[in-house]
Amino acid sequence: MNTVGVVGMGYVGLTMAVALARKGFTVHGVDASPAVLAALSEGRAHLFEPGVEEGLAAFRGERLHVGRELPPDGVDAVMICVSTPTSPVTHAPELENLRAAARHVAARCGPDTLVIVRSTVPVGASRNVVLPELTGRWGARVRLAFAPERTIQGQALRELEELPQVVGGLDAASRDAAAALFSRVTRRIVPVGSLEAAELVKLVNNCHTDLIYSYGNEVALMAERWGLDPLEVIRAANLDYPRPDLAKPGYVGGGCLSKDPYILMSAARAVGYTPWLVGQARGLNEHLPLRVAERIVALIREARGSAEGARLAVLGWAYKGWPPTDDMRGAPIHVMLPIFRAAGLDLRGHDYLVAPDVIRGLGATPVSAEAAWDGADAVLVITNHPEYAKLDLPARLAVMHRPAVLFDSWRILDEDAARRAGVRYAGIGYG
């Protein structure tokens, strides 16, 4: 097995394509976006992921090819890595991309090709959506597997080699073929008994993460009502206590955690079960950016008497700061912006990886991390990008307009420095 197609050149597919090329496979990447294909053809990654652009430079045109279609003579294996969004209105899974990808694979390949679904899907989608497209062209002889992507953005290439790879198959032969392929990429394979078991692994992993973080946020919101410092409570609760740690409060977004709970809930309801915890956790995490935005506006009004025309600098527009990413899917700022606009705030914005044009397109004036503080009535640090903690905070605070507010979401800045400068300091559930 030497040639592999990767359908979908987003965060999942592009990193997988580079990882495969690094291991000696000849890779044919496919994407429907002309802009994505143009960038990749020039050796430019259209997204930020450490090591990807270097991989493009090393393998493009030799072991890594990109185009709108798979080669006409097929490939040994295909990985389907297309996006599976949920409806912004109903949150129902939208599987048109998955179906179209399967149809393309069926048209360009044959029954000897191993098809591996890597997109996050509802339980049963590989069998009920992908398989019919393949059997419709090939007949009953199909090799189909599901192998979930479980890496974290910012460390994806490393984790592709280090994390155990779960693999389920339509049958044992399909599963074993996929396991053999992935054994050339990663150190450990975890076989499971079906496509559906592998699909559920991905969903429960992500929903568990969402749930863990939501409890830290709940603790913060409760502590705020008692006038307590949630970080003091959480650190004391965790210290040398041999039980699962409480999570630090913070935003929970991204392309996976913002949609996968809805995919799991939809799949569970389809078989007659309504989850108790999954939806509550997601709802709390979605509420948090709204709560913070309203709190920022209230603090500005408290300081100035009115928020109209006040300058707010927002640092960190991606959905997270560590590991760094430029991904804005599920970013807190999307929920916050309508609140800020309604309050009449004058917005400045900075992110170390999100392009200035993107920030400008969302209605803020792009500035440097240092200039963001100049004349600001308030500064909101959304992400925990480590470079923000390295700023000369006393110097930055000195150029803010007075009275001033600093909302440090992740509590990565020096609270004492802010208080010494006469700046109101607050964080999630604090201040």
Language model: regions and residue ranges:
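Structural/interface elements that position substrates and couple domains in central-metabolism enzymes
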Residues: M1-G431
